[in-house]
Amino acid sequence: MKSKSRLNRKGTPRRKRRKWKVVIATLLALAVITVIVSNVTVSHWSRGRCHTNTENVPSGRVALLLGTSRLGRHGNLNPYFVYRIDAAAKLYHSGKNRKILISGDNRRKGYNEPEDMRNALIAKGVPDSCIVLDYAGFRTYDSMVRAKKVFGQDSLIVVSQHWHNERALYIAHRIGVEADAFDAKDRTGFTTIRLTVREWLARTKMAIDLLFMHDPHFLGEKIEI
């Protein structure tokens, strides 16, 4: 009897460990499935809506330029910033849109994505009167929801890199905004690999936001464009 009791006591921790291994393996599998489904869904739905030629972009919509930092981590000019400015200016000068809504981060002192992008667009010949700033576009999800709920836009042309545009277009679809996108030039090499991994995770976070229809960090009063 004593020997059997000792075996039971020794066996219990093993069963618990096996149980936790199963739980952890299940959670990891669900996480991987969520990442894969989110990415496949976004890429599939946005197919044919991301344009590289201004002639294929629908006319008359407000262009939503998604913000990014003017400077990189080492203080150099951020290529993504330059490429997005070039794309937004090109789109404007093509006559496809008469207004540009710049949505970016301005939550800390000395960091102002919308202002930096406005100044760069003005330097490219875009009139200041055609530019509207959204200082609370802390995330792509926030930018898309605020474009509709705060700035009253039901149709948009999103301007950013292709991988970013895909996610923005899917968010637009889910919140009831008709949208196409104009792809800015992208980078190549190791940076692209790192951003691809980050984008996979961002799309998973997006799926959670859309599942619960979270509100942006800030909404506030409506602003007419």
Task: State what each model feature region is.
Residues 31-34, 86, 202:
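Active-site-proximal helix/loop capping residues that flank conserved catalytic or ligand/cofactor
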Residues 40-196:
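A structural signal for short, hydrophobic/glycine-enriched beta-strand patches
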Residues 1-4:
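N-terminal targeting leaders characterized by basic, low-complexity, disordered sequences
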Residues 6, 26-29, 90, 218:
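Acidic/proline-rich low-complexity IDRs
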Residues 193-215:
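A transmembrane-helix-recognition feature enriched in membrane-embedded lipid enzymes
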Residues 8-55:
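N-terminal type II signal-anchor transmembrane helix
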Residues 214-225:
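Short linear elements at protein peripheries
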Residues 16-21, 189, 193, 197-200:
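Structural motif marking the loop-to-transmembrane transition
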